[in-house]
Amino acid sequence: MTLLTACGGGESNVESGNRDGFLHYGNGAEPQGLDPHVVTGVPENHIVRALFEGLAVKNPITLEPEPGVAERWDISDDGTVYTFYINPEAKWSNGEPMTASDYVWSWNRALHPDTGSLYAYMLYPIVNSEAYSKREITDFDQVGVKALDDLTLQVTLNAPTPYFLQLMDHYSSFAVHPETLLKHGKMTDRFTPWTRVGNIVSNGAFTLDEWSLNRRIIIKKSEHYWDRDAVALNGVYFYPTENVVSEERMFRAEQLHYTQVVPLDKIPEYRKQGNTSYVQAAYLGTYYYLVNTDKAPVDDVLVRRALSYALDRDTLTRTVLQETAIPAYSITPPDTLGYNPPKLFDYDPAKARELLAEAGYPNGEGWPGLEIIYNTQEAHRKIAVAVQQMWKKELNIDVSISNQEWKVYLNSVSQRDFQVARRGWIGDYVDANNFLDLFLTDGGNNNTGYANDEFDDIILNLAPKAKSRDERYSLFYKAETMMTVSYTHLRAHVTAMYLV
């Protein structure tokens, strides 16, 4: 990251931050919360990962797992038993030592059906975790998580899981402080005051110092973090700014060191600048539209196919997105750790019109209407307008678009109160499984209504037991093919752009 230095009269945030060791960060929306077992969004992720740390952490360059709370680990010869040895210096922010029992309690909470964690399925590689999460068993002692002593945690898996250590760096696997949660409610309660300033006890490099709603969140370096001397920053200011233009203006005024959003019409200007602060880089993520398969008219696969064939992704990425993205024809990004997903369709407006007519809407006649929802941001609006215009031009159908504030949007998606909804998925770990398991039947992040027993069996049982990477990827390809032809989501692009 490049830190900017201020110029002109008065001291900017960048100038004071450079002097005092505080990063000023544009964080998009106001976070829904800071509970690792409840939140799901990118704005929440940035803060939660600063406040908490997992058993392992990813090296930012190699992406390989490195020691976090666990100073080391052993893996059995058959790859199914992980033994984590907790660092004796790992402490909670109140100074209490971390223990293996903290993880047993926390994973009980994350998997408990009453908690309603949308990421519970992340822990399904663990023996009996899925059965516990689905109330098929009620005794957590039957789940493959055991505290052998205060500093030794043993985890038993259903099958060798290549990405399991990467999961230890995802907030769904983070430990929470049991006594703090129970002081403010039951183990499974959601959005209680335990995450507020003065209440929260965390274990990461930073602690929560201030949370001024819709203004800023301040975190400061923790006095009790085990690797405190390696933390370069004294703190971070997170600013919730859903207005992209305002956030970019803050960046230019040197009120921010870093922003991940850039007004699309400003990108050519930044590209022309010498020594520019604009960075465009590969991102393991896919931008797509969710389709609620229980809502007419998109409950008809013919309609969903027509909408997909009528979407000109090349034009969208070239003109609207200023070539900051590549067209996406699958949920999994191309070449994800060597896995290349199927491409089963392309832009074909004639085929789209044929499919729509077959569905009973020739040339758009009798079309009942359709709404796209998206969370408030200018780029999302421009994409929605472009898609709206493409569908009108090619299919002669009317589509309305509606923006929603971040928390309202998250609720609409989780309650499946939409026909078509903007969505993006950033890889939590580097593996195609992280994109495909989004569509498991009744999965916490499956908001489409897609349900396929064969798909579930491949993702949950067959792929984990594959004898080779080629066999595993072949199974992924089969699963992604059957899921793609259901057209439960309309892939748009893969992208990354930000200012530093």
Mark where each language-model region is.
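N-terminal lobe/hinge region of extracytoplasmic solute-binding protein
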Residues: 26-77, 199-202
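Surface-exposed binding/hinge segments that line
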Residues: 104, 111, 118-183
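Ligand/substrate-recognition segments at binding pockets and active sites
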Residues: 213, 357-427, 469, 496
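Append "and occasionally in soluble cytosolic enzymes with long acidic Gly/Pro-rich linkers
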Residues: 220-221, 299-389, 393, 449-454, ...
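Extracytoplasmic/peripheral linker and loop segments enriched in polar/acidic and small residues
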Residues: 318, 397-409, 414, 434-491, ...
